[in-house]
Amino acid sequence: MGSLSIWHWLIVLLIVALVFGTKKLRNIGSDLGGAVKGFKEGMKDGETPEGQQRDQLSRTNTVDVDAKEKAPHSGDSR
């Protein structure tokens, strides 16, 4: 009564195929495969070597400015 044998799994698979149909199961399989592929690509894009990150940060153009008080507009009546 412990684990299920191969015959139990084959019967379950046959019942699932009869209930859902092979076309529906094929669509579910392809959708699941596409989702896993997209997840793996997303994980690969998120991982960048640390050396590349430093290079990207050092290449940014920085503009040094000093903040001054804002001059009132001539139209302001405050």
Swiss-Prot record:
Keyword Amino-acid biosynthesis: no
Membrane topology classification: Single-pass membrane protein
GO cellular component entries: TAT protein transport complex
UniProt keywords, alphabetically: Cell inner membrane, Cell membrane, Membrane, Protein transport, Translocation, Transmembrane, Transmembrane helix, Transport
Basic and acidic residues composition bias: residue spans: 39-57, 65-78
Transmembrane segments: 1-21
Subcellular location(s) of the protein: Cell inner membrane
GO biological process: protein transport by the Tat complex
Region (Disordered): 39-78
Entry annotated with the keyword Transport: yes
Gene Ontology molecular function: protein transmembrane transporter activity
Chief location category: membrane
PANTHER family, alphabetized: SEC-INDEPENDENT PROTEIN TRANSLOCASE PROTEIN TATA
Function of the molecule: Part of the twin-arginine translocation (Tat) system that transports large folded proteins containing a characteristic twin-arginine motif in their signal peptide across membranes. TatA could form the protein-conducting channel of the Tat system.
Assembly description: The Tat system comprises two distinct complexes: a TatABC complex, containing multiple copies of TatA, TatB and TatC subunits, and a separate TatA complex, containing only TatA subunits. Substrates initially bind to the TatABC complex, which probably triggers association of the separate TatA complex to form the active translocon.
NCBIfam families per the UniProt record, alphabetical: PRK02958.1, tatAE
Family classification: Belongs to the TatA/E family.
Protein name in the entry: Sec-independent protein translocase protein TatA
Lineage: Bacteria, Pseudomonadati, Pseudomonadota, Betaproteobacteria, Burkholderiales
Name of the gene: tatA
